[in-house]
Curated annotation (Swiss-Prot):
InterPro entries: ARM-type_fold, eIF4G1_eIF4E-bd, eIF4G_eIF4E-bd_sf, MIF4G-like_typ-3. Residues 188-299 are annotated as: Interaction with PAB1. The gene is TIF4631. It is found in: Cytoplasm; Cytoplasm, P-body; Cytoplasm, Stress granule. Residues 29-46, 65-74, 175-191, 879-894 have a biased composition (Low complexity). It comes from Saccharomyces cerevisiae (strain ATCC 204508 / S288c) (Baker's yeast). SUPFAM superfamilies: ARM repeat, Eukaryotic initiation factor 4f subunit eIF4g, eIF4e-binding domain. The modification Phosphothreonine is found at residues 181, 888. The modification Phosphoserine is found at residues 163, 195, 503, 883, 892, 896, 908, 948. This is Eukaryotic initiation factor 4F subunit p150. Component of the eIF4F complex, which interacts with the mRNA cap structure and serves as an initial point of assembly for the translation apparatus. Stimulates translation by interaction with polyadenylate-binding protein PAB1, bringing the 5'- and 3'-ends of the mRNA in proximity. The formation of this circular mRNP structure appears to be critical for the synergistic effects of the cap and the poly(A) tail in facilitating translation initiation, recycling of ribosomes, and mRNA stability. TIF4631 is probably essential when TIF4632 is missing. Residues 140-151, 218-228, 246-276, 283-294, 309-333, 504-521, 532-569 have a biased composition (Basic and acidic residues). The keyword RNA-binding applies. Residues 7-16, 47-56, 154-166, 229-244, 355-368, 908-922 have a biased composition (Polar residues).
Length: 952
């Protein structure tokens, strides 16, 4: 023990006098270095503008002394002066009127004349108000008595002095973890005392502070070794496991779990009890000023954090206690070979209390406030200790996870356990264990069995810690696709709804995924884009255009296809009879005619080309397409059976029957083929007929055969053969409509062939005779429609036609007279539908009354020029009719002005026509007419009326 410790009163007086001399200069120097003023515990209010701090004292007699204001926030506490009092000179006497005078509870001995010598310090009883007492408790809630700890440490230090070995170790540790500063040893020699007076107060404070820290660490090291030896003596096997909670009997000291370096991860070390620095109390004043410690009050969030960390460490400690003996032996050898750390690392919750007590010790031992350099050195030492704690904790966590990873905390294991678990029928009425709140009833839905709120699910966030294993990742996780929905920040829309917006105070409001705040000040973005990109506040969802959604879905599909494992597919082997488009199929060989230029076509190719050309055939392109058709027909020159010519005539005939409206155009096509066909074409089966005659033979034979069959046989019938009345829009309905269209198209096509003189009058006479035969015996509606269609087509021309049969001559008009006689009988007697009956009446009127001048005569295919000419004619007719009507109206109005309108009585309900005021204004004023009317009546109906009628 040093002389300074043996004579605390003398040491305190020396320190006090030195503090009084150096305090003003040190304060001025330190504040000039900082460059700002310290108000209320070092808060920076006005930088570079010192108030009452750059002077050795307050010129206005401020009562707070030459130091800072309020001295760490304690207004009237004597302990805040740190063992020294301000000098009582004239400048420190409070002036009334400038500051509020607080009561002075004692008269310090410095209140003497300024020039008098200082007297010996005499302890004076302090009359300060009793501050609020804060009770310090342990983790278990028991009361912590700091005085008893202080006494116990004093007794332990008296029994045994500190060995030099820990001091050397402490010195090495302090050199490695803190700033390298030599620690001066206090001496009792007068020469050293005189040299200490010359040293600045800041340097003395720094050295004293470092010395006390080293003494405290040495005491902790000694106590830890004693506890290790005691625990190893009681338990024959040294404890090499993780730290356990060791409690001393008869003491209520808080327990502190110690965290060692990675080399000592599994060593069993007793917890360090919270100490009170007795060494500092011995070197400070002894009973002059009694200090009341005011520990720091923790906030609610800090307490929750401390409790959570405490639980986690307790769980880790319990898990480490259950380790096997071989692991203990390995850790024992590792610990024996590893060096013992010089300082103990404590839990985070007890570090706060230790810091508070170290602040109390500093205030009790140091006569002045530690400078910035002292605080920095202490912070460096604390950071070094925290670094050691973090390293040991990380290594301990890694070891623990490696040892406890036995496959029970994987996703696959949890899923297997859930399969065997009994499901909960009603999650809202189920009794959950203590500490777990059930789900809120407002999330209950009738059509969904299990619904939970976020509050219920967040309870299991820290309790269920599992990691993904390879089996689960391969089977399930690889198939999970997170859509970009939500957002372009690589997060879903729902992920930012709960926890990511707390800093903005929105709680559960979803912010714009597309950074709306950054875009709000942009003037270059268009209004349309800003509407798309901003949030929809009603739905809390960002607007996405349809194109973006389609792109996103397309990208998702591509991503899913990429993620799917590619299946091995056998290469495609094309079959011999596979379907190939005609334009892709290439001929291996081309058949050429003997001339070497003309290409010979098969029957299928002829039909395909004819269908294509007939679909393109119009009156505007008639010449070009008909020339191509004629070229195909001329291929029959190199044939002996006329196969190509038959195919051409067949396709034209089918197309003409299927499209009755274009029958005249197809008849013109047949006429061009007959006229321009190569006369060298022959057919072995039809001798004597070549070229055009062969075409007419094919055409007449095809029309005659189809006309004899009729089109009634193509109509759908019942099983017994009776006609079927198909339902609307059914397959039978379309089949019947197609058969009717083709039958009437055939009759119309035959009629246009006759009008182009491709069929003779004799052929047409045979057609009418066949129809008249069918009309005599209960004719069908199909036969009557065919007769009406043929008469509309060839009636006018057949009326004047005649032909010879042997020596007799037959007139067409005579045949038509007998035909219309049969039709009159059918109209009067036969039971036919009204539609057919009116058609027969119309065709009868067309012959007898209109002389075959029908309005529908020109209803056929027309060119674009013909359509325009027809529209122009109709427009001119309409204009002429309007001009005629205007002329008629003008003439009638001219006569109406000459009439005298009868006066309309009020009781009469007859409305009279009012004429324009414009004409009445221009007209000259009426002349007086004689009362007696003349015999000439101005009213055209006056001859039918009497005089009494006019008067009325």
């Amino acid at each position: 023990m040093t002389d300074e410790t043996a004579h605390p009163t003398q040491s305190a007086s020396k320190q006090e006098s030195a503090a009084l001399k150096q305090t003003g200069d040190d304060q001025q120097e330190s504040q000039q270095q900082r460059g700002y003023t310290n108000y209320n515990n070092g808060s920076n209010y006005t930088q570079k503008k010192p108030y009452n701090s750059n002077r050795p004292h307050q010129q206005r007699g401020g009562k707070f002394g030459p130091n800072r204001y309020n001295n760490r926030g304690n207004y009237n506490g004597g302990g805040s002066f740190r063992g020294g009092h301000m000098g009582a000179n004239s400048s420190n006497v409070p002036w009334t009127g400038y500051y509020n005078n607080y009561p002075v509870y004692y008269q310090p001995q410095q209140m003497a004349a300024a020039g008098s010598a200082p007297a010996n310090p005499i302890p004076v009883e302090e009359k300060s108000p009793v501050p609020t007492k804060i009770e310090i408790t342990t983790k278990s809630g028991e009361h912590l008595d700091l005085k008893e700890q202080h006494k116990a440490k004093l007794q332990s230090q008296e029994r045994s002095t500190v060995s030099p070995q820990p001091e050397s170790k402490l010195k090495e540790t302090s050199d490695s973890t803190s700033t390298s500063t030599p620690t001066p040893t206090p001496s009792t020699n007068d020469s050293k005392a005189s040299s200490e007076e010359n040293i600045s107060e800041a340097e003395k404070t720094r050295r004293n502070f470092i010395e006390q820290v080293k003494l405290r660490k040495a005491a902790l090291e000694k106590k830890r070794k004693e506890q290790l030896e005691g625990s190893s003596g009681n338990n024959n096997i040294p404890m090499k496991t993780t730290p356990e909670n060791v409690e001393e009997k008869g003491s209520d000291k808080p327990e502190v779990t110690e965290k060692t370096k990675p080399a000592e991860e599994k060593s069993a070390e007793p917890e360090v009890k919270q100490e009170t620095p007795a060494e500092e109390g011995e070197q400070g004043e002894k009973g002059q000023i009694k200090e009341e410690s005011t520990p720091k009050v923790l906030t609610f969030a800090e307490r929750l954090k401390l409790k959570k960390q405490q639980k986690e460490r307790e769980e880790k400690t319990e898990g480490k206690e259950n380790k096997e003996v071989p692991v203990q032996e390995e850790t024992k050898s590792a610990i024996e070979s590893a060096p013992v750390p010089p300082s103990e690392q404590v839990k985070e919750e007890t570090e706060v209390a230790e810091t508070e007590q170290s602040n109390i010790d500093e205030s009790a031992t140091t006569p002045a406030i530690p400078t910035k350099s002292d605080e920095a050195e202490a912070e460096v030492e604390a950071e070094a200790g925290d670094a050691g704690t973090k390293i040991g904790l990380e290594a301990e966590i890694e070891t623990t996870t490696d040892e406890t990873d036995d496959g029970t905390n994987t996703v696959s294991h949890i899923l297997n356990v859930l399969k065997d678990a009994t499901p909960i029928e009603d999650v809202f009425s189920f009794n959950y264990p203590e500490g777990i709140e059930g789900p809120d009833i407002k999330y209950k839905k009738e059509h969904v069995k299990y619904t939970y709120g976020p509050t219920f699910l967040l309870q299991f966030k820290d309790k269920l810690n599992v990691k993904a294993d390879a089996e689960w990742v391969q089977s399930t996780a690889s198939k999970i696709v997170i859509p970009p929905g939500m957002g372009r920040g690589n997060r879903s829309r729902d992920s930012g709804r709960f926890g990511n917006n707390s800093s903005r105070g929105h709680d559960f409001r979803n912010t714009s995924v597309r950074n709306m705040d950054d875009r709000a000040n942009s003037r270059t973005s268009s209004k349309r884009r800003s509407k798309r990109m901003n949030d929809d506040r009603r739905s809390n969802r960002s607007y996405t255009s349809r194109r973006d959604r389609e792109r996103g879905s397309y990208r998702n599909e591509e991503k899913r296809e990429d993620d799917k494992p590619k299946e091995e597919v056998a290469p495609l082997v094309p079959s011999a009879n596979r379907w190939v488009p005609k334009f892709k199929s290439k001929k291996t060989e081309k058949k050429l005619a003997p001339d070497g230029k003309t290409e010979l076509l098969d029957k299928d190719e002829v039909e395909r080309k004819m269908k294509s050309l007939l679909n393109k055939l119009t009156l505007e392109m008639f010449d070009a397409i008909s020339s191509e058709i004629l070229a195909i027909a001329n291929i029959s020159v190199w044939e002996t059976n006329g196969e190509t010519l038959k195919a051409v005539i067949e396709q034209i005939f089918l197309k003409a029957c299927d499209e009755p409206h274009w029958s005249s155009m197809y008849a013109q096509l047949c006429g061009k083929v007959v006229k321009e066909l190569n006369p060298d074409i022959t057919d072995e089966t039809n001798e004597g007929k070549t070229g055009p005659k062969l075409v007419l033979h094919y055409l007449v034979a095809r029309c005659h055969a189809e006309f004899d069959k009729g089109w009634t046989d193509k109509l759908p019938t019942n099983e017994d053969g009776t006609p079927l009345e198909p339902e609307m829009m059914s397959e039978e309905y379309y089949a019947a409509a197609s058969a009717k269209r083709r039958g009437l198209g055939l009759v119309r096509f035959i009629g246009f062939l006759y009008r182009l003189n491709l069929l003779t009058g004799k052929m047409m006479f045979e057609c009418f005779r066949r129809l008249m035969k069918d009309l005599t015996d209960s004719p069908s509606e199909e036969t009557l429609e065919s007769v009406v269609e043929l008469l509309n087509t060839v009636g006018e021309q057949f009326e004047t036609d005649s032909f010879r049969t042997g020596q007799a001559t037959l007139e067409g008009s005579q045949l038509l007279d007998s035909l219309f006689g049969i039709l009159d009988n059918i109209i009067q007697t036969a039971k036919i539908s009204s539609r057919i009956k009116f058609k027969l009446i119309d065709i009868k009127e067309l012959r007898h009354d209109k002389n075959w001048n029908s309005d529908k005569k020109d209803n056929g295919p027309k060119t674009i020029q013909q359509i325009h000419e027809e529209e122009e004619r109709q427009r001119q007719l309409k204009n002429n009719s309007r001009s005629n009507s205007r002329r008629t109206n003008n003439s009638s109005n001219r006569h109406s002005f000459r009439r005298d309108a009868p006066p309309a009585s009020k009781d009469s309900f007859i409305t009279t026509r009012t004429y324009s005021q414009r004409n009445s204004q221009r007209a000259p004023p009426p002349k007086e007419e004689p009362a007696a009317p003349t015999s000439t009546a101005t009213n055209m109906f006056s001859a039918l009326m009497g005089e009494s009628d006019d008067e009325e």
